[in-house]
């Protein structure tokens, strides 16, 4: 259930990728790259929303916070469905993201309520496996809808999926935060919790690393349709190539779930970051030598490797960032999610809007984020760990 709720985020992002150009033309986008904002504004809503639902879930319980989020998502889906210009569409997408922040944030707290350490990393990896399987089929779903209906039918499908998922959640999931563990809502408490999260070296460092990973990934997502459908002229075959790459992340998450109990979160993350950074540096030099137009098979090979490494790191970094925050799991997940998304959205928009008919901006994004992740994680791992709070 957690995986499928999380997958609604992926479905809302990826199902309309094949339709971005058509949506932009119908709604009066002034430039081709402006259509990318349909993806970016959902992430912007996610960033702002996560700062709300964590504290709310600590006060009212996990389920009421999710109910509020789904309500906003359904309103945003309806607004996007009926949009007649790009600004209205972007408003609807922002509301969708604002609503989807609830399952994205609160799910981490729900899992942390019941698991910790490698066990939590294992659960999160399996959640990510299904979460990534959805992007493998979402563009195909969107392309299939476009073959038989208008692009607005994609948003009608999202509206229906939201209603079904909300009903399943309401009927089947018990509340995981008991009444005695709930904390009264207080701005002072929120401020103290934010300070604690941001001053804890481990949580802050791994959260920044998550933001850097997401930056490169958002830049890739924003320009994937232009790269594959236009630059490589794949047309309706775009969903197939996108699915192959999405499955690389999903398979990595599955593999990580199998290996993390044996090798540990830090070791798997450390080797994945090193390997992906070296590969990115080498491929960037190769891309420059081709004028930003590498053969499709080399581009696919590189992306398969880099996304597999990112899939290994993502679940582990989430778990390691949350490890010291068990006593403030709700707001801890909120701050972690909001901070990482606020890092990724502007950087991802910059990468996507830099698309110039070559893959240089996207590969640059992966290379630069890889180097920065190495620096940040080295800073985290070489400084002695801080003592764990007695309340943890």
Residue ranges and their predicted role:
Residues 88, 117-118, 122-171, 177:
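Helix-loop-helix hairpin linking two adjacent transmembrane segments in secondary transporters
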Residues 64-78, 159, 268-283:
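Structural signature of the two symmetry-related core transmembrane helices
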Residues 47-87:
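Conserved MFS/SLC helix-loop-helix module at the cytosolic interface between two early adjacent transmembrane helices
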Residues 92-133:
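Cytoplasmic helix-loop-helix junction between adjacent transmembrane helices
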């Amino acid at each position: 259930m957690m995986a499928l709720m999380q997958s609604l985020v992926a479905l809302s992002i990826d199902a309309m990728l094949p339709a971005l150009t058509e949506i932009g033309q119908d709604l009066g986008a002034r430039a081709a790259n402006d259509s990318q904002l349909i993806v970016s504004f959902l992430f912007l809503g996610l960033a702002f929303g996560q700062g709300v639902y964590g504290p709310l879930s600590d006060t009212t319980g996990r389920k009421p916070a999710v109910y509020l989020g789904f309500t906003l998502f359904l309103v945003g889906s309806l607004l996007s469905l009926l949009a007649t210009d790009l600004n209205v569409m972007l408003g609807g997408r922002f509301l969708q993201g604002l609503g989807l922040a609830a399952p994205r944030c609160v799910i981490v707290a729900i899992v942390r309520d019941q698991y910790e350490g490698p066990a939590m990393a294992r659960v999160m990896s399996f959640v990510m496996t299904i979460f990534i399987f959805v992007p493998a089929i979402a563009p195909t779903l969107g392309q299939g809808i476009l073959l038989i209906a208008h692009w607005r039918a994609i948003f009608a499908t999202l509206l229906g999926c939201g209603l079904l998922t909300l009903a399943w959640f309401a009927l089947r999931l018990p509340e995981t935060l008991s009444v005695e563990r709930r904390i009264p809502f207080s701005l002072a408490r929120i401020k103290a919790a934010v300070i604690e999260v941001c001053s804890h070296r481990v949580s802050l460092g791994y959260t920044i690393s998550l933001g850097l990973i997401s930056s490169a990934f958002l830049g890739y997502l924003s320009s994937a349709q232009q790269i594959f459908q236009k630059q490589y002229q794949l047309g309706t075959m775009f969903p197939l190539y996108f699915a192959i790459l999405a499955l690389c992340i999903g398979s990595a998450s599955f593999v990580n779930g199998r290996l993390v109990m044996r090798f540990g979160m830090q070791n798997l993350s450390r080797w994945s970051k090193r390997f992906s950074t070296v590969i990115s540096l080498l491929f960037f030099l190769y891309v420059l030598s081709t004028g930003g137009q590498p053969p499709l098979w080399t581009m696919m090979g590189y992306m398969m490797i880099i996304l597999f490494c990112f899939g290994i790191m993502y679940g582990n970094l989430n778990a390691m960032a949350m490890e010291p925050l068990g006593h403030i799991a709700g707001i801890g997940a909120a701050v972690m999610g909001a901070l990482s998304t606020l890092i990724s959205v502007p950087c991802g928009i910059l990468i996507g809007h830099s698309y110039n008919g070559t893959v240089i901006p996207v590969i640059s994004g992966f290379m630069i984020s890889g180097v920065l992740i190495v620096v940040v994680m080295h800073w985290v791992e070489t400084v002695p760990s801080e003592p764990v709070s007695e309340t943890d």
